[in-house]
Amino acid sequence: MIPEKRIIRRIQSGGCAIHCQDCSISQLCIPFTLNEHELDQLDNIIERKKPIQKGQTLFKAGDELKSLYAIRSGTIKSYTITEQGDEQITGFHLAGDLVGFDAIGSGHHPSFAQALETSMVCKIPFETLDDLSGKMPNLRQQMMRLMSGEIKGDQDMILLLSKKNAEERLAAFIYNLSRRFAQRGFSPREFRLTMTRGDIGNYLGLTVETISRLLGRFQKSGMLAVKGKYITIENSDALAALAGHTRNVA
């Protein structure tokens, strides 16, 4: 039976909100490891925003850190603007990811966050979350796990760009994306790229032409099937090997 206070919150939000207790990707997000009482406390501080449309921004570089954003659905890209005025993509965030961690140190966002497709996010006031985590060890631990995961991702990206050639970079990108989809309960073998080839090239330090040529090469070798933005992994062992991994896509 659904507790009365949760029903009231649903009525107040128009009956369309998905709360932490019911969210399908909560195991990837802040609620993981929290008990029911802790979940209720967290739920009370979260604002469920209306859908964010493609091209809209969650925050801009230089904005004061007021909230973190947990992605419920869709894809958000983070990027900075170089001194030359060029966009440099620093990450692609999927459902279950938390966006805005990199602003905690200075109190201001060093990057932009923009929706690549219609997305749903939970807005979490940072000061309130920080205060709550001081009272809830499980919440504090989970925040540290999420931040650790982001640091590890940054380290992997540095290694990717410094050690791998163009083929290996793209293979690693597709392989890692498939693993992330699998963690979220989606097919790791068949998926749609929400980012453009230009975005992928920008992120990997490659040209659009190189991305297109490599995708064609991967398809010709039987490793992938490519149809527009849709990718099917035909030979997961070959992809994993080229990406520098030995485990199968599962």
From Swiss-Prot:
SUPFAM superfamilies: cAMP-binding domain-like, Winged helix' DNA-binding domain. [4Fe-4S] cluster binds at C20, C23, C29, C122. Residues 47-50 are annotated as: Activating region 2A. It is found in: Cytoplasm. This is Fumarate and nitrate reduction regulatory protein. One of its GO terms (cellular component) is cytosol. Residues 20-29 are annotated as: Essential for the oxygen-regulated activity. Global transcription factor that controls the expression of over 100 target genes in response to anoxia. It facilitates the adaptation to anaerobic growth conditions by regulating the expression of gene products that are involved in anaerobic energy metabolism. When the terminal electron acceptor, O(2), is no longer available, it represses the synthesis of enzymes involved in aerobic respiration and increases the synthesis of enzymes required for anaerobic respiration. Gene3D superfamilies: Jelly Rolls, Winged helix-like DNA-binding domain superfamily/Winged helix DNA-binding domain. Residues 116-121 are annotated as: Activating region 1B. It comes from the Bacteria. Homodimer. The lineage of its organism: Bacteria, Pseudomonadati, Pseudomonadota, Gammaproteobacteria, Enterobacterales. Residues 181-191 are annotated as: Activating region 1C. Residues 164-237 form the HTH crp-type domain.
